[in-house]
Amino acid sequence: MMLQIPDVLTSDEAAYCRGVLDAAPWVDGNVTSGFQAAMAKNNQQLPQDGAAAREIGAIIVQALNANPLFVSAALPRTILSPLFNRYGVGMGFGDHVDNSVRRDPVTGQTLRTDLSITVFLSDPDDYDGGELVVEDAYGSHLVKLAAGAAILYPASSLHHVTEVTRGVRTASFFWIQSLVRDDAKRGLLLDMDVAIQRLSGAVGTTDPSVLSLTGTYHNLLRMWAEV
């Protein structure tokens, strides 16, 4: 399941985040790379334990936890502290698959990476290239979203970032361990949740059909969740 989540941050919030990040020190992006990724990676990254990363990371996590679409789609159990990368002219990131398990250097937690998320912080008109390209059974998907929007996709996906040819692309990226590890099951639960919300709007939250479907949703989640 691949899902665009618009307006995670407002335009003003995204601009504030960019301002803080632009003033922060950046290092070579291979600091956090696994072996495969290091062979393909050419970007800059913000130190994860720095003040800027902590401040902006907290803003992003708070915004995601308040976003109903993200919560419904990801069913987050643990969210890794956000990381930040920057691509200037000539920089890109070749094909790779993210590590299956990661340790959060900020919290010390170890998590299974079920989902990857990128929150775009640069306006798409401010740079050329820099598209996130995610591969799945249906082909290649090019993603370049408005500042403040996010893309959520399975961490098992082969993906890359195309070379930037003008401007600078700044984004936050990180991983989520879901309550439901199986992507297909998460997709079914999201479809059911969306359908329940639509039905509730049409017939009311106390309608017997809404109550029945809500019960079925929670019983499926109870069956599949790992806590």
UniProtKB/Swiss-Prot annotation:
Q: Which InterPro entries match?
A: Oxoglu/Fe-dep_dioxygenase_dom, PKHD_C, PKHD_hydroxylase, Pro_4_hyd_alph, Pro_4_hyd_alph_FE2OG_OXY
Q: Binding residues for Fe cation, per the UniProt record?
A: 96, 98, 159
Q: Which residues bind 2-oxoglutarate?
A: 169
* Presence of keyword Metal-binding: yes
How many cofactor units bind, and how? Binds 1 Fe(2+) ion per subunit.
Catalytic class of the enzyme: oxidoreductase
| Domain Fe2OG dioxygenase residue range list | 78-178
Cofactor(s) the record lists: Fe(2+); L-ascorbate
Q: What is its EC number?
A: 1.14.11.-
* Pfam families registered for this protein in UniProt: 2OG-FeII_Oxy_3, PKHD_C
Task: Give the top-rank taxon of the lineage listed in the UniProt record for this protein.
Answer: Bacteria
Q: Which UniProt keywords apply?
A: Dioxygenase, Iron, Metal-binding, Oxidoreductase, Vitamin C
TM spans, by residue?
Answer: none
Which Gene Ontology MF annotations are present? 2-oxoglutarate-dependent dioxygenase activity; iron ion binding; L-ascorbic acid binding
What SMART domains does this protein's entry cite? P4Hc
Single GO biological process annotation from the record: intracellular iron ion homeostasis
List the NCBIfam families.
PRK05467.1-2 (NF003973), PRK05467.1-3 (NF003974), PRK05467.1-4 (NF003975)
Its name, as the record gives it, is PKHD-type hydroxylase Caul_0045
